[in-house]
């Protein structure tokens, strides 16, 4: 390591090092926020795909979110490459820092404000995506609950219709009467008829034998 002189280290001022550190922190925050957003959305999409509801609306949302995830992943890769370059060869890092050394303080302040503005913009986008995810999740659960309610109602109505049809198509079976039961039934009817007519008159029997002619 070379000797330090003044407020510099390896020919780099502490202000320049602070600016580099701020930029690295900014990139790290962006990567973490983007990764969190992707993981959260993947979990949401997996839950939607594993659910019972598979309509065209959710398919469209899924395809749209895949495109958004692809863009976020490209941004993450780009930011990681920049971070690797800055963490790689020290000479390259110093050369990139020397670029800032040649810039006036006013330009550095403008750059710093621009980085802070980009950070706030990215944070705002993440909040917006989180809000959209929450709204879509509520809409999904509401639609799913309505679907289950409709299915339960349809099942109940279908069961009532089946019971009604079964009652109309299946009349009560009639018992066939056997001949013995029929005879007994006729005998009972005859007794009932005689009872209505009154007591039956008995014919007196003669105890005398007929006389024989000699």
UniProtKB/Swiss-Prot annotation:
Residues 154-214 are annotated as: Disordered. InterPro entries: DUF4600. It comes from the Eukaryota. Keywords: Coiled coil. The keyword Nucleotidyltransferase does not apply. Belongs to the CCDC169 family. This is Coiled-coil domain-containing protein 169. It comes from Mus musculus.
């Amino acid at each position: 390591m070379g000797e330090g002189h003044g407020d510099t280290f390896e020919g780099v001022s502490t202000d320049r090092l602070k600016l580099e550190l701020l930029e690295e922190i900014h990139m790290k925050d962006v990567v973490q926020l983007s990764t969190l957003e992707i993981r959260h959305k993947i979990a949401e999409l997996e839950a939607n795909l594993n659910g019972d509801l598979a309509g065209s609306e959710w398919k469209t949302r899924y395809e749209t979110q895949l495109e958004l995830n692809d863009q976020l992943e490209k941004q993450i890769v780009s930011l990681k490459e920049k971070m690797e370059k800055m963490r790689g060869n020290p000479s390259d890092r110093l050369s990139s820092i020397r670029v800032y050394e040649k810039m006036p303080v006013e330009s550095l302040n403008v750059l710093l404000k621009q980085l802070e503005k980009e950070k706030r913009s990215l944070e705002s986008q993440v909040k917006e995506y989180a809000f959209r995810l929450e709204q879509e999740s509520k809409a999904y659960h509401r639609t799913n609950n309505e679907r289950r309610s409709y299915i339960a109602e349809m099942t109940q109505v279908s069961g009532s219709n089946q019971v009604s049809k079964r009652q109309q198509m299946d009349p009560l079976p009639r018992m066939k009467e056997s001949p013995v039961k029929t005879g007994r039934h006729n005998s009972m009817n005859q007794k009932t008829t005689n009872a209505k007519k009154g007591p039956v008159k008995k014919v007196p029997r003669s105890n005398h034998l007929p006389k024989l002619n000699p």
